[in-house]
Regions:
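Conserved alpha/beta cores of soluble small-molecule-handling proteins
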Residues: 6, 10-158, 165-169
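Glycine-rich phosphate/ribose-binding loops and adjacent secondary-structure elements
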Residues: 136-204
């Protein structure tokens, strides 16, 4: 059965985590914001939206089943990936009329156990203004594979992406948030139409002491 998403990249996802708080309870990080972002991606990809309450309740019901998989180690977490893909048995170029929404989880440790060397990418582009950068589209990740491999061949572990127009302004890092300490203040890249960071939106105005 040939699925439309296999040929058109009609797939998008979110990446979330569940942790245990000091009381041992399982908690989610900004689930309604993630639901909103999921729907923003859906609209951009011509896919159906999901009611935010339904999205969040689905996660809660799944965590009731998978709660024993949430690590107790405070540096570990349960990775959660909600995603949707087209299911029409059609190979033409058009939005699908049917989709499947799924969520899978797996326990994970710290992504990196030590500081890593990173490369500032000034040749290749992950996402451009007006494109699908703010949508968690599968094609965004495919665009990063080749430059990431080149960086790894040079001994780097990750990329820091710059703007597509001038390669002058830092936008984001590949698998993490990027921030700097400048004049005693914590500085993060501006939120743009290529990426939105909820960690950025969560950070208060911070002064490094």
């Amino acid at each position: 059965d040939q699925r439309l998403s296999r040929g058109l990249g009609d797939v998008y996802k979110r990446q979330m985590k569940a942790h245990r708080n000091e009381k041992g309870e399982v908690v989610l990080f900004r689930p309604y914001d993630n639901a909103k972002r999921f729907n923003q991606s859906a609209i951009r990809m011509c896919m159906p939206t999901i009611a935010e309450d339904l999205f969040v309740n689905a996660l809660k019901e799944l965590l009731k089943v998978d709660h024993n998989w949430v690590p107790k180690n405070p540096s570990h977490s349960l990775y959660i990936r909600p995603f949707m893909f087209a299911t029409d048995p059609y190979v033409g170029i058009r939005p699908s009329e049917s989709y499947r929404f799924m969520v899978f989880t797996c326990p994970v440790g710290s992504y990196y156990s030590e500081p890593i060397p990173v490369k500032i990418e000034t040749t290749y582009t992950r996402a451009a203004s007006g494109g699908t950068g703010y949508a968690k589209a599968a094609g965004n990740y495919a665009a990063a594979l080749y430059p990431a491999k080149l960086a790894q061949d040079e001994g780097y572990k990750q990329l820091i992406w710059t703007d597509a127009k001038e390669h002058k302004y830092i936008e984001e890092a590949g698998t993490m948030n990027v921030m700097f300490v400048m004049d005693g203040k914590l500085v993060t890249p501006l939120v743009s139409d290529t990426t939105v960071s909820y960690t950025h939106l969560t950070l208060p105005t911070t002064t490094i002491v």
